[in-house]
Structures are given as C-alpha cells and as structure tokens.
Curated annotation (Swiss-Prot):
Capsid protein self-assembles to form an icosahedral capsid with a T=2 symmetry, 35 nm in diameter, and consisting of 60 capsid proteins asymmetric dimers. The capsid encapsulates the genomic dsRNA and the polymerase and remains intact following cell entry to protect the dsRNA from degradation and to prevent unfavorable antiviral responses in the host cell during all the replication cycle of the virus. Nascent transcripts are transcribed within the structural confines of the virion and are extruded into the cytoplasm. Binds and removes 5' cap structures from cellular mRNA. This is Major capsid protein. One of its GO terms (cellular component) is T=2 icosahedral viral capsid. The gene is gag. GO terms for biological process: viral translational frameshifting. Acetylation is necessary for viral assembly. Keywords: Acetylation, Capsid protein, T=2 icosahedral capsid protein, Virion. It comes from the Viruses. The modification N-acetylmethionine is found at residue 1.
Length: 886
C-alpha cells in the first residue's frame, strides 16, 4: 500500500511530489514532519512532474496496548506518548512509531462541534493506513513503495474537473494489468512499438506476449525508478506462482484509452503495485470485476475473441448520446486459452457495452427488462466514470431509464425517489450538500451470474465439477479464486460485479482515500449490507472442504496447500470463507489467513508487524479478517485439528470442528463505529489493544452511533436491542414489516449499536442486580465502571444467582417464524454474561464455551458473545481490531 495520488510539487504534506485528485489539492495522508500544516490542502497546481530520490520517511511511534488513559490528542505530545508506552523497553522500541501527522489530522478533523462525522472516519482510515505502512520493521523497498506512483495517471474525468492530461496515461503494461488482473507490471523500463510483443526483462519477470495497439502512443510510456523496480521484482516473485502463466496462455489486448479506469484505477492501481502478497486474491477479484463492469468497447474494437461476448450477462446496456469518434475507444481481446476457461458450460450472454460517459456528454442507461421485473433485483446499478457518488433507489415504479448528465448528475427525475424504502439510508449518504446519482446497485441472481451457471464452477486446472483440464493451472489461482464454488453440495452463485464493488470499498478505506472516495465506499458497502441478508457458509478441515473448490493455493495431497518450506507449512493455515446471499450470490469469498507464496520467514515477520488486522491464535496468525463479526468464538485449524480460543491463545476443549465466523452487516457498521470510537493510539495493534477510549473520542462514537441509528436503521430494525426493551418490563412485539425483510437478519445489526443500546459499553467492571420491592420478577440492574461509577441503571429481569442478565426470546422467535427470514431463531433463553462471571480465566473459558454450545442461532451468537466480551476492554478491542483492515 502506498500513499499519495499522483504527480505534484513537493511540500511538507507531499514530500514525494504527488498530487491528489481530491479537489485538485494534496492528500493529507502524506506523512509529514512535526510542523505539518494544512495550508496546501486546497492548493491547485499544474501537476508538474518531479523526479529524484524519495526523502526518508520518518520513523513513527504510537502508544500501543497498555495505556490506561488516552488524553485528547495534541501536536506536541510526543514525550507524554513515549512516557506512557508501558511495557518493557524492548516493547517500547518495537512499537515506537511517531505519528505527528496523524495527531495533526486528528486535531484538524476534530475541531468544532459542527465537524461532520465523515471526516472523523476518513481520518481514522488514513491513520490506519499510515500507521501500518510506516512501521519501522518494513524494508526500505516497502517504505519507498510510494515512489512507484511514477506509473500512476491522473484521470481527467474522475471528479468532474479537468487536469492536464499530457503524460498522464498509463503505461501499456500497467493498463494491461489493470484490465486483466493477471500480471505484474511487465518490462516497464522499455519503450514499446505498436503490436510488438513485450518480452520479459532481466529482473526475472515471466515472459509475456501482449499485443500493444498502435493507439497507445509511445510518449505515454513511463519507466520505473530503481526502487520501483525492486518493488515490482518482489511483487512479481510473489505473483508468479499463483497469478502468472506462460506467454502462450496469456492475453492479446488492444487498449485504446487511459481514462477507462476512472475512479477504479485511482483505487486499485496503488494496490496492484504494492508488494504485500496478501492483497493478491482480493485484487484479482476486484480487477476482474472491473473488467466485467467496464466491458468491451465499440466502434473499431473487434469482439470476436472477447470473453465478454460469451460469458458476461447483460447487466446494463448503455448508449452514448455523443459521437465518440474523436475520443479514444477501448476494448479487450483475449487469447482463447483464457476465454475457454469461462466458456465451458456457460450459455451465451449479451455483450456488455461500455458504461462510460465522457465529459460533456450524457448517457442513457437502459436497464434490461429482466432486471426490472425480477424480484431478485430490488436495486439497479448505473456506473459512470464521472465521479465516485452513486445513488440507490427502488424500482417500485418500474423505472427503466435514467439520464445521466456530464458529471453523472441525474438530468431527469426518477419518479419513485420519494418512495425510497431506504430514504434514511440516502440521508446518510449526503456529503458536501450533493445529492445526485452516479451509481445504482444492481442485484444479481443465478440467471445473471458470471461465470457460473447451475452451480458449475471453473477451475484453472480443472474442468466443470472438478473434472477435466483446461491447461491453465497457473492462471486459475488468479482467476479461479474469484469464482469459488466450494463443492457440489452447495450451489454457490457468484457475481464478480458485486464482489468487485464490495472489494472496492474495502480498498478505498484502507488507502489514501479522499472524502469522496470514502463516501463512495460507504455507500457501496451500505447498499450491500442492506440489500442482501447473509448467511455464512464456512468450510474448514483439509480433506473434505478443500477438495473440490477453487483455492487460492495449489492443492496438495499432504496438507492442501503447496508451500515451499517446512517453516511455512508449520506456521500458516488457511480458511476459505464464503457468504451465501439469497441462495444466489457470494459477496465475501476466499479470505486468506496466510500467504505461503513468498516462502520466507522474513516476509512472515514483516506482515506480522505491519498488518493491523493480524492477531495470533495459538500458533496461527490470522489476517484479513475483513468481513468478520465479533462473534468469532473459536477458530479451527485444519492442519492441527484443534480449536483455539482467540482471546487467550489457549485451546478450547470442545468437539466442535467448525469455524464460527459471522459475516454480514457488521462489515460496514461495526467497523466505522469502531473507527469513530477508538483513538489513533489504539490503531497499532500487535496482540491486544487495551487503551481505553478517551472522553472526546467516545463522544465521537456516540454521535456516530446516534446518527447511524437515526439515518440507517431508524425504522426499528435495531430497536430490538434497545436496553429499555431488553431489560425493561415490556413485551417484545417485534419490528414493523417492510417490503423486503432486511430486518430479518439480526446478525446484520451493528454490534456497536447493540452495545450502545444494551448499555454494555466499554470497561464495565461488574453488574449489580437487585429486586424491586412490590414488583414481582422485576429487578434493578446497575452496571458500574472501573471507578465504581454507575454506567447503566435500568429495570429488568435477571438471575441474581448467576449474576447474569437473562433474556427470553420466545416471543421474538414466534414472530420470526411467521416471516420469510432465512435464519430460524431459537426460543432458548439467552444469557448476557457479565464481567464478574468471566473475569476468572477458567470461568471465562467456560462461559465462552457455554455460549458457543447453547446458542444455536448464529444471529444471536453475535449479540451474546459480543456482550460476553464487550465488558473487557482488552478483549473488545482485540476483537474489534480484526476488522481494522477494512
């Protein structure tokens, strides 16, 4: 990962001379000295190119786990921070990271009561990225990864204003990568002639034959710096085993434009170039989805050899209202070896024309009738290159055309905007006063899924249903991972379009994102979370689960993973995790918990230090827990056959052999609530984060939660978790029905909101229960913090002998049984175990196991087990941080 967004003049905020597309100014994520200012934030420059050696990135230090009080961040607080590091001297040295830029950003975004919540989140996202990237344990190549932005273009249409376009185009090889997702950047230090094959360079890159169209002019070629070459060499060595193939099996491409990627290129390209291999599978999925979304070109582009003509469904049909003859066109040609991977068993589909509306033109999006009439498509997608905003609207009024203006703004009103089922969601999407349409989400069911039909999956080295051979064993790990059908017992339909969009927000929020980009990401993620109630489908255990599905790793008869060293074999493990959506689509797929592609303990150590999301489970390092809920109670290691208690690194003595990972709505809500609730010092995470939440930051958290509840879930979806309802003497009457029962999946209710409602806030030490005189069965429940102050005082029912709050969900279960909810609820009595009951490690483990064994509905596992954990600050932060990688 890198920071910065292009070319520009150097400044304290911009030591590399990179320019941001954000309002023509500079990206405040750039790490800066102590005297950082924001004077240049809105500075417009002509984006002159600057070259030369990259300045040294200052080492940074951050207050790690162990701090008991987190004061309001101040710019000159370094001494206090270092003093309060806590722990041994070695721990101090290891965690010393100066974060003056982050502190400045924090103060900048925290000024004044009128500061909107979004900048707070943006700041946290930036801080997350920065702290992870400036870790002193990273190598110089990693530290200087930003220099590879020498390849990065600035797209003139991305944000609705012009930029100087000369020398801004992608290199041919860079564009090849972005369009195919199947190669590292090739020999970018060479100048190419039209239609000449690109040969592998002297740095060990594989040989590729990529036909370069004459439309891609040589003056736009760029060269990598020596540092960039080192980065690419490292990246390529990691990509080669799983993504690359011989030259005869790759692509022939004709690429006619440099601005086709628009905002997607802005998001993806930095990650394409970064050397950490754990992003590889997500990147490839996202890039392939990008191809899907953009589609082939028109005009002079011949589609005879395109994969799109046979495999991509007609999600959208777009006709440009302006003559594009004077503009560069784009299209994608592929060799038959690649095309045939997706052709077998897939009925012909219509070609997907381009969805780009050039500046100054308008586009009319014609939505296929099947998308309008199918009940599986509650939302519609319009994707244009004019900017990151999008809009979500219902198709109740059967609207099938939308006019998009030159900046993606809607030029003709949609009649059913006023009938939005999610009008509160739209209120959440207001940003900088704009309300206009760029993208509308399209749902997909099994008739509109690429490339699977009727459960048939395509594996690079396997044919349909795991038989046959396409002769592309090297390609499949890059492509096949995107479309995973785990076995014939589960009919998993995959939409790379949806997966790509879901991945998009993940990448936006972990990089140098501007406010607009973060806004787009939140909208996309929110749309997914609301439209698709999810059920997790989890596979673990080597012999059966990994036998007949597309894995990121080469299969091995020994341990299901092809690794090079015994050390890697003994350390890394992998879990393939999927989410089945409406029995039709998978949003979250292969989540790599380990990447044995570098075959190096040094790489493992670097990742261990650099990845915010990593924490240890026994001997098992976990990372990329991007979509996980807080109810991850136990983790099953397939190679050892053991269950691990993620909190204490201790084995759980249990017969369970499943991975209890809840995925769904919390990917959005929990994460952003967490970002708003934890100070910057807590972002650096080794094993456990114990820093309590400062008063100021907690107020930010509360404001965010209140707004989120009001704008996002205000139609009583999460009122089920209101403390007055849970603990009061009221009856639970259920929630109001809505056209689509999104509220059915309580698992998707944001867990921080549950905590907010239930009063199980951070740091309670104990719960006191007293009978209320004169009222049978009613007790006073008091929660106190570490200082003995009352945190929550409510009336309700409890079991004093267990020092626990008992909740009878029978009424709720009965209500759920009358709905179309996919998750059946049990009428078992739930227990929210309090701090006193789990303080002792033995009792704690017992309580945890009890929760796992007695609570059947996974949707309630989240509530119960979060409540179980939330009273312990360290554990809560520990679990919360698993999603800090989003």
């Amino acid at each position: 990962m890198v920071w910065g967004t292009g070319y520009g003049n150097p400044s304290p905020l911009n030591p590399y001379g990179f320019a941001s597309l954000h309002r023509g100014g500079l990206n405040p994520l750039i790490l800066a000295p102590e005297n950082i200012t924001f004077d240049t934030l809105n500075t417009h420059n002509d984006h002159e190119e600057t070259h030369g050696e990259s300045p040294e990135v200052p080492k940074a230090s951050i207050a790690p786990a162990g701090r008991q009080n987190v004061p309001v961040l101040q710019q000159n607080q370094e001494n206090e921070d270092n003093h309060a590091l806590g722990g041994s001297e070695d721990a101090k040295d290891e965690r010393e990271i100066r974060f003056s830029a982050i502190k400045t950003l924090y103060n900048y975004y925290s000024e004044g009561p009128s500061t909107p919540i979004m900048p707070h989140l943006v700041n946290r996202l930036r801080g997350l990225d920065a702290l992870a990237k400036i870790d002193a344990t990273l190598t110089k190549v990693d530290m200087n990864a930003a220099y590879i932005f020498a390849l990065r273009p600035t797209f003139p249409y991305s944000y609705g204003y012009k930029q100087r376009f000369s020398n801004r185009r992608l290199t041919t090889s860079a564009l090849c990568y972005a369009r195919t997702g199947l190669s590292s950047f090739l020999t970018v230090d060479k100048t190419y002639t039209s239609n000449s094959p690109l040969k592998g360079g002297s740095r060990g890159w594989p040989i590729f034959n990529v036909d370069v169209s004459s439309h891609v002019a040589e003056p736009h070629m760029r060269t990598l710096s020596p540092i960039g070459l080192e980065v690419f060499n490292l990246a390529t060595s990691q990509f080669s085993k799983t993504l690359l193939t011989a030259s005869s099996k790759v692509f022939t491409q004709s690429l006619y434009t440099a601005d086709i990627l628009s905002i997607f290129g802005e998001v993806f390209l930095p990650h394409v170039m970064q050397p950490v291999s754990n992003y590889t599978p997500i990147l490839v999925r996202a890039l392939l989805a990008l191809i899907h979304i953009l589609g082939p070109g028109s005009g002079n582009c011949s589609l005879s050899s395109s994969i799109f003509e046979s495999s991509i469904p007609q999600f959208l049909t777009v006709s440009h209202s302006t003559n594009m003859s004077n503009r560069t066109r784009y299209c994608l040609h592929t060799r038959s070896a690649y095309k045939d991977m997706f052709r077998n068993g897939i009925p012909p589909q219509s070609t997907l024309p381009p969805t780009l509306a050039p500046e100054g033109s308008s586009a009319r999006v014609l939505i296929p009738e099947a998308l309008v009439t199918s009940p599986m498509f509650p939302w519609l997608l319009i994707l244009v290159s004019s900017g990151p905003q999008f809009f979500l609207y219902s198709k109740d009024a059967s609207i099938n055309t939308v006019d998009i203006g030159s900046r993606g703004r809607i030029t003709s009103p949609i009649p059913d905007v006023a009938k939005l089922d999610l009008h509160r969601l739209w209120n959440l999407f207001r940003f900088d006063g704009y309300r206009y349409i760029d993208v509308v989400i399209v749902g997909a069911d099994r008739d509109y899924v690429w490339p699977y039909q009727n459960g048939v999956y395509v594996h690079g080295g396997k044919g349909p249903n795991g038989t046959g051979n396409y002769g592309n064993a090297d390609v499949h790990d890059g492509i096949g991972t995107i479309f995973s059908s785990f076995n014939n017992n589960v009919n998993v339909q995959t939409s790379d379009l949806m997966l790509g969009l879901l991945t998009l927000w993940n990448h936006i929020t972990t990089t140098y994102a501007t406010e607009e980009e973060v806004t787009m990401a939140i909208k996309i993620a929110a749309a997914f979370a609301l439209v698709y109630p999810v059920q997790p489908i989890v596979y673990s255990g080597c012999p059966k689960a990994f036998q007949r599905h597309t894995s990121y790793y080469q299969p091995s008869s020994e341990n299901c993973y092809a690794t090079d060293t015994a050390e890697v074999k003994s350390v890394w493990d992998t879990v393939e995790l999927s989410v089945q959506v409406n029995n039709a689509m998978v949003l979250g797929m292969t989540l790599p918990f380990g990447q044995p592609t570098l075959s190096s303990a040094q790489w493992y150590n670097n990742i261990d230090k650099a990845e915010i999301s990593m924490f240890k489970v026994g001997n098992l390092p976990l990372q990329n827990l991007d979509y996980l809920s807080l109810d991850m109670m136990e983790f099953y290691a397939p190679t050892t056959g053991q269950l691990y208690d993620i909190r204490s690194d201790n084995l759980i003595l249990s017969a369970h052999r499943t991975v209890n990972l809840g995925i769904g709505y919390t990917a959005l809500a929990d994460f952003f609530a967490y970002l708003a609730s934890v100070p910057a010092q807590s972002f650096y995470h080794d094993r456990m984060v114990t820093s309590p939440i400062s008063k100021q930051t907690y107020s930010v958290y509360e404001r965010f939660i209140e707004r989120f509840i009001d704008d996002f879930v205000g139609w009583d979806r999460c009122d089920l978790f209101n403390l007055d309802t849970l603990l009061g003497a009221k009856h639970i009457a259920g929630v109001a029905s809505s056209p689509i029962p999104w509220h059915c999946s309580l698992q998707r209710c944001p867990l921080p909101i549950i905590m907010h409602y239930t009063g199980l806030t951070f740091g309670q030490e104990h719960i006191t229960v007293r009978d209320v005189a004169g009222v049978e069965g009613l007790q006073q429940i008091v929660m106190r913090d570490f200082q003995g102050r009352i945190v929550v005082e409510r009336l309700g029912t409890a079991a004093p002998s267990r020092i626990a709050v008992k909740l009878d969900w029978s009424r709720l279960s009965a209500w759920y049984s009358d709905t179309t909810c996919a998750i059946p609820l049990s009428d078992r009595v739930m227990e929210i175990v309090n701090y006193a009951a789990i303080w002792d490690p033995t009792q704690e483990r017992h309580a945890q196991v009890s929760c796992t064994h007695t609570l059947a509905p996974i949707s309630f596992r989240a509530l119960t087990c979060l409540s179980l954990y939330s009273i312990r600050v360290s554990t809560l932060h520990h679990l919360m941080t698993t999603r800090a990688k989003l």
